[in-house]
Amino acid sequence: MELGRVRGSVWCTKKSNDLSGCKLLLVEPWDPLGQPGGRLRVCADIIGAGVGERVVLTTGTAARKAIGQPDCPIDAAVVAIVDGCDA
């Protein structure tokens, strides 16, 4: 899992049926000290995070399991909104 901050939303006029009803967010990975770093990721959002919020994201098989669709074509999912972090 990784920490990140939601930078925006992604809208798609056409997408895989597996993604129907799935909100997509643009998330910037952060290190544990709260410094941005890494490439922006498009993440499926299963918890209703908003722009500017700090989040936990997971990738790969864990992301697909998190949204309850093991065959869904996603690589990353937001699984928590961060209230605080001590490092």
Model-predicted regions and their roles:
Residues 39-44:
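Short alpha-helix capping/helix-loop boundary micro-motifs
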Residues 1-32, 37:
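N-terminal first-folded block
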Residues 7-9, 14, 29-30, 45-46, ...:
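Fold-independent oxyanion-binding glycine-rich loops
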Residues 56-87:
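C-terminal structural segments of small proteins and small subunits
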Residues 14, 38, 63-67:
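A short, acidic/glycine-rich surface segment
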